Amino acid sequence: MEQYRFEAEGPAGRIEAHAYDPGKRRGIALIAHPHPLFGGTMDNKIAQTLAKSFLELGYLSVRFNFRGVGTSSGTYDEGIGETEDALALLEFLKKREGNLPLALAGFSFGGFVQAKVANRIEAEKVALVAPAVGKYDVPEVKQDLLLIHGEEDEVIPLSDLFEWARPQGHAVTVLPGASHFFHGRLAQLKKIVVDSFKD
């Protein structure tokens, strides 16, 4: 395994990204971080946990900073420009790495963005951790979906996620006692992702 930082060109300019590369790849996983106006970056612990989960599954695992975060160009755009950034980065990776299967994962605001991305591309796997339903108009996700939420989430109430998931028929994996940031539960979170997506 190697890891490295790189840059891609997006609609607002530079996109700063980080990759975990397993060598032999079964696909590309793109991970989106929580809300940029509340300190969210690609180095968020849950974003890193998701990246390491997909690395273990054999994916080239890429997390990136939304516009206006770190050295990424631009300014916060309420999920609209952030979706375009994600799509531009996926296009860049497809050209560089070839037409590998795609997986999407996102936490909180990043889950909202990845739900939008999932409606624009063919993704083999989608994992949303505490997606920001109730805060944003999160679109339906047609793909098979792994939804993970903390029972004691103080930012996105579990009941809001049930309201969003119920009409779509999506199952929800609930971690009893876990908060929005899954304090002390990251190893468990990783195991759920890896076990869910193992062949």
Listing of model-derived features with the role each one plays in the protein:
Residues 14, 23-65:
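Short, surface-exposed "cap/lid" segments of acyl-processing enzymes
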Residues 157-165, 187:
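Short alpha-helix in the alpha/beta-hydrolase fold that links the catalytic acid
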Residues 105-114:
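Gly/Ala-rich beta-loop-alpha elbow adjacent to hydrolase catalytic centers
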Residues 1-24:
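N-terminal cap/lid segment of alpha/beta-hydrolase-fold proteins
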